[in-house]
Amino acid sequence: MIGVVVLGATGRMGRRICRMVIEDEELELVGAIASPTSKHLGRDVGLVIGVGETGVEIAPPTALPNIAKDADVAIDFTVREATLENAPKAARAGLDLVIGTTGFSDEDLRVLEHEIEEAGVSAVISPNMSLGVNLLFELTRQLARVLGDNGFDFEIVEIHHRHKVDAPSGTALELAAIIEEELGKGEKVFGREGNVGPRDDDEIGVLAVRGGEVVGDHTVMALGEYERIELTHRALSRDAFAKGALVAAKFVVEAPPGIYSMRDVLFGGKRGEGL
């Protein structure tokens, strides 16, 4: 059995991950971490998420070193500030990591990856753990590779629930980065307003829409003079992300020390390798 600690266990994603870890025959939930100010501290996580008693109490981040003694991997779906503080603690305690938090700057990622590498553990870091979204990444790569030199413009539209705190989504930014990489050029434009003039050939438009309880929609458009291609992924449940996180957890505990992406999990290799 693979021992799992869930960081952000009482959040939207954390609750789903805890439930799915409990249901998975290869995994064992050994720790549930929540904010130091959480009203659920000290309660059985199973009672909080509605699955009955589990014997696992919700604990603050200060409990990580002790909980890590019985764990193999930490799954972190929290917020930028919490991950930057707690993920290095988990790594120094010897835990491999699966990080699905978004909202990092490039410098944040450099610092985080350095801490993980210094600790000598393995980590999967991805803005979206959904298996379908990671296939969308690969299809977008092919789309840009084939059409990029044929006069097509690329635009990205993402839609999320009204509670999401960062925009555009990490997934949309990753899609834009993939297009930039394949084109060898690109300038992200975040929405348009006023007299902006004609579209520049290097632009990659990124539009964020917020409202309702949309789990997450992402559309990549390749717009040519005579035709348009759209690739769309719609998440129907947060379980799509939780399922991917569990797949990543099973991968990372067997992987050599280093930094991995979901591309590596699905297609093999290490960051920068694969398809």
UniProtKB/Swiss-Prot annotation:
Enzyme Commission numbers on file: 1.17.1.8
Which residues are named in the active-site annotation? Answer: 160 (proton donor/acceptor), 164 (proton donor)
The superkingdom listed in its UniProt entry is Archaea
Q: Which reaction does it catalyse?
A: (S)-2,3,4,5-tetrahydrodipicolinate + NAD(+) + H2O = (2S,4S)-4-hydroxy-2,3,4,5-tetrahydrodipicolinate + NADH + H(+); (S)-2,3,4,5-tetrahydrodipicolinate + NADP(+) + H2O = (2S,4S)-4-hydroxy-2,3,4,5-tetrahydrodipicolinate + NADPH + H(+)
Major localization class: cytoplasm
Query: Which keywords accompany this UniProt record?
Result: Amino-acid biosynthesis, Cytoplasm, Diaminopimelate biosynthesis, Lysine biosynthesis, NAD, NADP, Oxidoreductase
Which GO CC annotations does the UniProt entry carry?
cytosol
Keyword NAD part of the UniProt annotation? yes
Q: Which GO terms describe its biological process?
A: diaminopimelate biosynthetic process; lysine biosynthetic process via diaminopimelate
Checking NCBIfam families in the record gives: dapB
Query: What family is reported?
Result: Belongs to the DapB family.
Functional note: Catalyzes the conversion of 4-hydroxy-tetrahydrodipicolinate (HTPA) to tetrahydrodipicolinate.
Put simply, this protein is called 4-hydroxy-tetrahydrodipicolinate reductase
- Its source organism is Methanopyrus kandleri (strain AV19 / DSM 6324 / JCM 9639 / NBRC 100938)
Q: Which gene encodes it?
A: dapB
